[in-house]
Amino acid sequence: MDHLPIFCQLRDRDCLIVGGGDVAERKARLLLEAGARLTVNALTFIPQFTVWANEGMLTLVEGPFDETLLDSCWLAIAATDDDTVNQRVSDAAESRRIFCNVVDAPKAASFIMPSIIDRSPLMVAVSSGGTSPVLARLLREKLESLLPQHLGQVARYAGQLRARVKKQFATMGERRRFWEKFFVNDRLAQSLANADEKAVNATTERLFSEPLDHRGEVVLVGAGPGDAGLLTLKGLQQIQQADIVVYDRLVSDDIMNLVRRDADRVFVGKRAGYHCVPQEEINQILLREAQKGKRVVRLKGGDPFIFGRGGEELETLCHAGIPFSVVPGITAASGCSAYSGIPLTHRDYAQSVRLVTGHLKTGGELDWENLAAEKQTLVFYMGLNQAATIQEKLIAFGMQADMPVALVENGTSVKQRVVHGVLTQLGELAQQVESPALIIVGRVVGLRDKLNWFSNH
């Protein structure tokens, strides 16, 4: 270990920054947030330092580096654009046994600054030992996405409850189970973020009163259309906290690789015309696992409330009294059209967009007359097997035969393929495409040649 990671208590302690530019300003901001009593020594200062000085937040000393300013300091930072001056600051601090950071010169420094994820009082620091700051920044960004913004409020509130938890739960095991429930309770976190004291108190009392082996909960998460980068931050957080993930075939391998490693996984792959697991059985799986006290994530491609049968699954849970929540996802229509260079609306071509299922219940019929109207875009989900019928019906109800159409296969993924033509070719084009695929009908498809960006990357 090249460096010992420590967290310094700097509140009301004297610290010195030498330098008055942008880099020094970023360092000063961190020290001020830590409550340091800050002095800044430089030949010139950018305006922000003057603002802080006028507000009494720090002291400015204009002029060359004055090493006597170090005499009362606990910590120093050299942040000038002059290597010679920075080395003088480092040497003067070293002679006084004061820790000193030298910006962009880790070998000249006695401490380095990590990349910080601030969820005070929870703090996470990431460092590459000064060898690769970019790598440390990338790791910090990844951790930022995993830690909810309101986590600090939850941690602070947990501190207020420690004595009560210790009094109510006799064993370490019981306390651990309580805290596990506490920290994954979305309702509590959201209530704290909204400063809803009434909801916070109600949720807290419920957590203390219910048995530790109480029924779990189900979170319905939209995984987006395929590209793992389109998974929402909240969706990522949920699959990282799951005890069990129930997923279908539209969830990509890249997204499944983000699931918590020790979570159980249940595949319930479905596609139009063939159900690997019947819907009623899926409903029962969710119910059964939640009743065991597990945190269940039902992971669905796209958005769970847009042709995802999410409402049906939640009705079962609702009837059984199982708590649930929903994390929306980017629906296939939005993702596939964007990655195909096809805007769903456009002032010149489409003032509305319709999302339509091509897989109806037996005896069902679409409103073809309205679907054939001008100035709109149609997006058919699960319509591949019905492409010839869609073509026939739209033409029969008055849509122009030369209306542009596109079929997007494996949208937003590296396997994405788009075939396009006109309405009279739709049935034929569908023979060239495999599921999962989306059908887009409308004048906006004609913009694809101009706006297609994804296949050019």
Curated annotation (Swiss-Prot):
Short name of one Pfam family: Sirohm_synth_M
Family, as annotated: In the N-terminal section; belongs to the precorrin-2 dehydrogenase / sirohydrochlorin ferrochelatase family.
Residues annotated as catalytic: D248 (proton acceptor), K270 (proton donor)
Record PANTHER family: SIROHEME SYNTHASE (PTHR45790:SF1), SIROHEME SYNTHASE-RELATED (PTHR45790)
Coiled-coil region list: none
Listed GO biological process terms: cobalamin biosynthetic process; methylation; siroheme biosynthetic process
UniProt catalytic activity: uroporphyrinogen III + 2 S-adenosyl-L-methionine = precorrin-2 + 2 S-adenosyl-L-homocysteine + H(+); precorrin-2 + NAD(+) = sirohydrochlorin + NADH + 2 H(+); siroheme + 2 H(+) = sirohydrochlorin + Fe(2+)
EC number: 2.1.1.107, 1.3.1.76, 4.99.1.4
UniProt protein name: Siroheme synthase
Binding of S-adenosyl-L-methionine, residues: P225, G301, G302, D303, I306, T331, A332, M382, G411
Signal peptide location: none
Keyword Transferase on entry: yes
Disulphide-bridged cysteine pairs: none
Binding positions for NAD(+) per the UniProt entry: D22, V23, L43, T44
Region (Precorrin-2 dehydrogenase /sirohydrochlorin ferrochelatase): 1-204
Protein's job: Then it catalyzes the NAD-dependent ring dehydrogenation of precorrin-2 to yield sirohydrochlorin. Finally, it catalyzes the ferrochelation of sirohydrochlorin to yield siroheme.
GO function term, MF aspect, one: precorrin-2 dehydrogenase activity
Gene: cysG
Pathway of action: Cofactor biosynthesis; adenosylcobalamin biosynthesis; precorrin-2 from uroporphyrinogen III: step 1/1; Cofactor biosynthesis; adenosylcobalamin biosynthesis; sirohydrochlorin from precorrin-2: step 1/1; Porphyrin-containing compound metabolism; siroheme biosynthesis; precorrin-2 from uroporphyrinogen III: step 1/1; Porphyrin-containing compound metabolism; siroheme biosynthesis; siroheme from sirohydrochlorin: step 1/1
Region (Uroporphyrinogen-III C-methyltransferase) residue spans: 216-457
Alphabetically ordered keywords of this record: Cobalamin biosynthesis, Lyase, Methyltransferase, Multifunctional enzyme, NAD, Oxidoreductase, Phosphoprotein, Porphyrin biosynthesis, S-adenosyl-L-methionine, Transferase
